[in-house]
Amino acid sequence: FTFWYTADFFSSNNAWRTQIASYRLSGGFANDVGVNAITQPENGILTNAETVEISIRNFGSAPQSNIPLELRVDGNLVASETFTGTILENETANYTFTQTVDLSASGQTYSIEAKTALVGDEFTANDPFTKEVTNLLSNDVGAIEITAPVSGTGLGNETISVNLKNFGALPQSNFDVQYVIDGGTPVVETFTGTINSEEEVVYNFTQTADFSALGTYNIT
């Protein structure tokens, strides 16, 4: 069904304008399936034989079975397999590819695409699902932002605050953190907490810095 409606609104010159538009209600498709999630693998220390697990959804009204599947890594087809079960209308099913994938290069981000290839699929735009997965380094932590102090008036002895992130796969604790102002002597302290993989935390240095003199300061 197509519905037409008219709306009045103010234009940029404060004059009334009329807009005529339409929208359509559709009963959907009988044959329409697609991959709606890639649940495995996740970011971490990965190997040359990683299992790929996906979720398949039946978006259509007709039950579907024997659904062809394709698996790609960085655009390269690595597997063509078949889901042999049956998925009812608007339901999902999990599938694990028999073919594993090589994600063993440390520090590399891979693009994984899983796709249905149902013959007669009436809406193919929702067939594929893509996920980026990174093979994290074991130990990789760094400062991503200095959040304090900020430019302003009336500055004095100010606390230096930084956001730290664990980019690696292993939890990190008891590591040195430092700041330097205008290329001077580094102020080194120890972060005694624990940052889990891909987690961010705020660290406030105990030793403050003097910003009372007018001017621009470079903090690294």
Question: What do these predicted regions represent?
Answer:
Residues F1-G28:
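Beta-propeller fold recognition
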